[in-house]
Amino acid sequence: MTGIYDNKLTSGLEGKPKLIRLLETLRDHATATNLKWAEKLGINPSKSITCVKPEGTTSCLVDSASGLHPRYADYYYRRIRIDKKDPTYNLMKDQGVPCEDDVINPGNTAVFTFAMKAPKGTITTEDLRALDHLDLWKTYQEHY
């Protein structure tokens, strides 16, 4: 699961009881499905079924918050490193994407910078107290 803070229910904003009910329903369904298919395939069922994906690039591709983390800010820069031999390097450079040489490996690696805007109403790191974030993490650990 990822993009948790992009959804009022999965972020706990609609109340902890609703979130717990959702997480336990999802967990139970995933566990039952795992048992069903393990039996059909004649294999042992998985010991670990559910997870919160830590995320990175995929969340950028689908424009979601990353894993169990809120978005950084309403506006921020996303930077990626690309080998200068990669065809994507020339494509992005030719399209005018801001680019600079990597400090550690300037001869072989480039750093591209993208300006990012979070969706309106997004929960950001400034909106979230650390203890509330830990409490949500604990809820996921206990019920998912």
Model segments located where?
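Structured alpha-helical segments in the cores of large, soluble enzyme domains
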Residues: 1-6, 34-37, 132-144
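Internal maturation/activation junctions in enzymes
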Residues: 3, 8-54
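Short capping micro-motif at the N-terminus of alpha-helices
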Residues: 47, 60-61
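Catalytic alpha/beta core of large soluble enzyme barrels
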Residues: 54, 61-144
